[in-house]
Amino acid sequence: MICRTIVEGTTKISVPIPPPDVNFPPSAAPVFYNPEMELNRDINVAATAAFVKRLLSRKDLKREEVRYVDAFSASGIRGLRIAGEVGIHSTMNDWNPEAFELIKENIKINGLEEKAQATRKNANVLLHEQKFHIVDVDPFGTPAPYLDAAATAAQGMLSVTATDTAPLCGAHLNSGIRKYAAVPLNTEYHSEMGLRVLLGACARECAKHEKGMLPLLSHVTRHYVRSYLEVLPGTKHADRALKSMGFSIYCPKCGFRGPVYGLAVHIEKECPACGALTKIAGPLWLGPFREPKFCNEVLSELEAHPLNTKEKAKKIITFCRDELDIPMFYDQHVICKELGASATGIETLIEALKAGGFEASRTHFSGTSFRTDAPIAEIKKIIQALSG
């Protein structure tokens, strides 16, 4: 295995050089390393550091006693950065024997023998055998087969990545139903649909083990969904989390969307805005997908660490923090296309909605998306007025 040395943050590792004649080199290498996920890993360092500070303020723990596991480590870059840049004990696991050997080599390169260890086990077996304060599930594809074990092992925070956005977002409907036990819809807000389906699956898995979960930070970036969830033991927390579950109604004729809370509820088929037949997605998470206070703590950690993607990360976290807690965003371009209207600047639209007496905000999902409590008819009136 021919390798090269790369640096992320303050961590130096050896990674395999993939063949030059393949479409997606990272997946063709003997051990997976994707440089495009450095932004994800930078945010992970900041979010984990922020949570560790919370954990140490609440529990009688020393920093070196906090235990983190990366269940799918590959080169070990994610777990090594946590050990070296956050300063907690990191377990890096991978079933691939070449990955296992490379992780051990990279531990030595960084002098982290006292703070890090490599294991070679099936991820579900490891997570059923041991408990960790922070469990990180970042597989190649869907995390669904590992959520039960992850919910069992997580004693403080569960961090989850999903790259199977087509099933999550409704593009591959049956696959999404099989993996997440939820019906997604492929709408203009499909990225948020995927996030809420994933959060709903996590909430249900935690509840099975009499645990609740509270989303601290979630974002959809490029081809993946990423969430950081505080895991809270006890039936009270489990029941409270399930109260944020429900269904989303969508009218393909007029664009109406609305939440219906509850796992066993009566849902009218007719759109309350235009009377047409609606489509239903769920069950999914309808509560907030981030905690503004935690977002501020992550922003502080981003400033404190030397990171290559710092400015991009800060922009994502700031947008997440400032979004309204109203499920399912609108896309200005989709509405403009329906109306035959010209799009205006997104900030101009936000201000016009606020001037009309409504709440409104941008979102991190796209540059043309926004949230508002305005009825769909009022949104269209305002967009038409701005279009002239």
Curated annotation (Swiss-Prot):
It catalyses: guanosine(26) in tRNA + 2 S-adenosyl-L-methionine = N(2)-dimethylguanosine(26) in tRNA + 2 S-adenosyl-L-homocysteine + 2 H(+). S-adenosyl-L-methionine binds at R41, R78, D94, A123. Zn(2+) binds at C251, C254, C271, C274. Signal peptide: none annotated. It comes from the Archaea. Residues 4-383 form the Trm1 methyltransferase domain. PROSITE patterns: SAM_MT_TRM1 (PS51626). It is an enzyme of class 2 (transferase). It holds the Pfam family TRM. One of its GO terms (biological process) is tRNA N2-guanine methylation. Keywords: Metal-binding, Methyltransferase, RNA-binding, S-adenosyl-L-methionine, Transferase, tRNA processing, tRNA-binding, Zinc. Its EC number is 2.1.1.216. GO terms for molecular function: tRNA (guanine(26)-N2)-dimethyltransferase activity; tRNA binding. Belongs to the class I-like SAM-binding methyltransferase superfamily. Trm1 family. HAMAP family: tRNA_dimethyltr_TRM1 (MF_00290). Dimethylates a single guanine residue at position 26 of a number of tRNAs using S-adenosyl-L-methionine as donor of the methyl groups. NCBIfam families: TRM1. This is tRNA (guanine(26)-N(2))-dimethyltransferase. It comes from Methanosarcina acetivorans (strain ATCC 35395 / DSM 2834 / JCM 12185 / C2A).
